Amino acid sequence: MSRQLLQALEMLESGNWDGAHQIAQEDMTEMGSWLHGVVHIIEGDRGNAEYWYRRAGRRFPGMESVMGEIAAIRSALKG
């Protein structure tokens, strides 16, 4: 699934948050939940973003952290 999550990150970076959201919804792992939270940050939906960060077992970083979170997810996936 990590290949699909990397694809979703590329979608986010190119502005296709809907495509990234579809991938994240299908991945119920902690990484998928983390990515799902980032998608909701981009949407401006703080409540859902916080929910998905909790599901991922991660501290919610705030609404301004998108690029840093994308980089952190990419690094974790390539780890």
Describe these PLM feature segments.
Residues 6-10, 39-40:
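Residue-level signature for tetratricopeptide repeat
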Residues 4, 33-36:
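TPR repeat positional signature
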Residues 1-3, 29:
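Short, low-complexity N-terminal intrinsically disordered segments enriched in polar/charged residues
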Residues 37-46, 63-79:
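TPR/TPR-like alpha-solenoid helical repeat scaffolds
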Residues 19-20, 49:
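Solenoid-repeat scaffolds in large eukaryotic assemblies
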Residues 28-30, 42-64:
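TPR/TPR-like (Sel1-like) alpha-helical repeat modules
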Residues 5, 12, 17, 24-25, ...:
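Inward-facing hydrophobic residues that define packing positions of alpha-helical scaffold repeats
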Residues 21-28, 57-58, 78:
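A conserved position within tetratricopeptide repeats
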